[in-house]
A protein has these predicted regions:
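Two-component/phosphorelay signaling modules centered on CheY-like receiver
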Residues: 11-32, 46
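Non-catalytic signal-transmission and effector/linker regions of two-component phosphorelay proteins
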Residues: 1-3
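Basic, amphipathic alpha-helical hairpins
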Residues: 150-157
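Structural signal for short hydrophobic segments within the conserved structured cores
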Residues: 5, 29-32, 101, 152
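Conserved acidic carboxylate
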Residues: 8
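CheY-like receiver
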Residues: 23, 41-148
Length: 157
């Protein structure tokens, strides 16, 4: 079972994420909520979630800063970004820090459910219930080409 932490500064949206998805049907349980990255770091220590669903733009500590702090602490939690900010800079930063998905608001509960199902399939394929520690990108890593493509698209479109 995946333990989920929902990080969103807008309470109505945060509660909507918690209530809109049939977490039990996805073999998940929401173990905590946080209104910003600082609260999320405390919640990670307390609940040890395996999945963090987070906004990017939040007061005190944004989602990118939170992911950097999680990486520095060796967190093995998967991260799904759920944000209204569709900037390639944000997407690129989130991917570099190990985000497994990037969803845009407004979203439908089906989109979030699909992202969780995709993650569960990835976990099953890896044969583990937690992600490997967020690794540094290695030279020659195929994901660099994805990041380069995103950079190109951001510059030319």
């Amino acid at each position: 079972m995946l333990k989920v932490l929902v990080v969103e500064d807008e309470e109505m949206i945060r509660k909507g994420i918690v209530l809109a998805v049939d977490w039990a049907a996805l073999d998940c349980v929401v173990v905590g909520e946080a209104a910003d990255g600082l609260q999320a770091l405390k919640a990670v220590e307390r609940y040890d979630p395996s999945l963090i669903i987070t906004d990017l733009k939040m007061p005190n500590m944004d989602g990118i800063q939170m992911m950097e702090a999680l990486r520095a602490r060796g967190s093995r939690a998967y991260v799904i970004i759920l944000t209204a900010y569709d900037s390639f800079t944000y997407a690129r930063s989130a991917l570099r820090l190990g985000a497994v998905d990037f969803l845009l608001k407004p979203f439908h509960d089906g989109e979030l459910e699909a992202a969780v199902i995709k993650l569960r399939r990835r976990i099953e394929a890896e044969g583990s219930g937690t992600a490997p520690a967020l690794p540094e990108r290695k030279k020659g890593d195929k994901s660099k080409y994805v990041l380069q493509a995103m950079d190109y698209i951001g510059q030319h479109y």
